[in-house]
């Protein structure tokens, strides 16, 4: 375990590749692409606020060819959103074995997972205009709009949004953004393209 968190990387560098970009997170293209560490914080801008996030960082790798850019994003999350099980295979860590004297009675009915009020989600923000002014980090603003690629466990789909601040956004018509997601032993992995 590192004694300190890695330095957050800004900007993210995309590896140039020939041909199709694999959506397999174990493919060589992702092992060769530079990893960028991104620190995350609390969500204090809009209600309901989140003072104590369960996810504190994520890692991004990017690759591009002459047709598209793809992002491999992964993060550790101790609390799987059970909705994802409707859409893709999920591998959860088994509970640790307990000595007999710590075991309780088996429940009469199976335990139903609790569906969270807010599903797990991630959004990647791109500036619409490549001027020298960076857009506001949360959905840009009226003068500096952004394009968002957003994924959520509620649908396990990616959508594309044009945002002009916290209150102003519209779905991108003709969006071609796609996602392949995985959850394995406490780690979400996505390939957005």
Positions of PLM-derived features:
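Structural preference for beta-rich elements and adjacent junctions enriched in aromatics
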Residues: 1-193
